[in-house]
Swiss-Prot record:
Keywords: Cytoplasm, Hydrolase. This is Urease subunit beta. Belongs to the urease beta subunit family. It is found in: Cytoplasm. HAMAP family: Urease_beta. It comes from Burkholderia pseudomallei (strain 668).
Length: 101
């Protein structure tokens, strides 16, 4: 075993069980693709993405860690977000929060 290595059982695994989730419709209004990583505070993603930003405050994509969702120009899709855990404080990104939620 390598330090930090995780050995996962085969089969399906439920991510973020018991955590509050929401669904939002997101449209890429820009002329370039936008990719959003699994742990990016969705409220602060690229301004070319059009959606209810107030509803997304304190949420991230409900996808496996280390993965991402790509929004092609002109594409509209429904995504699922999961509430941020831990201390529920956000620092960095676009600097729109910089503290507790």
């Amino acid at each position: 075993m390598i330090p930090g290595e995780l050995v996962i059982d085969d089969g399906e695994h439920t991510l973020n069980a018991g955590r509050h989730t929401i669904a939002l419709v997101v449209a890429n209004t820009g002329d370039r693709p936008v990719q959003v990583g699994s742990h990016y505070h969705f409220h602060e993603v690229n301004d070319a993405l059009s959606f209810d930003r107030a509803a997304a405050r304190g949420f991230r994509l409900n996808i496996a860690a280390g993965t991402a969702v790509r929004f092609e120009p002109g594409q509209t899709r429904t995504i699922e977000l999961v509430e941020l855990g831990g201390a529920r404080a956000v620092y960095g990104f676009q600097g729109k929060v910089m503290g507790p939620l």
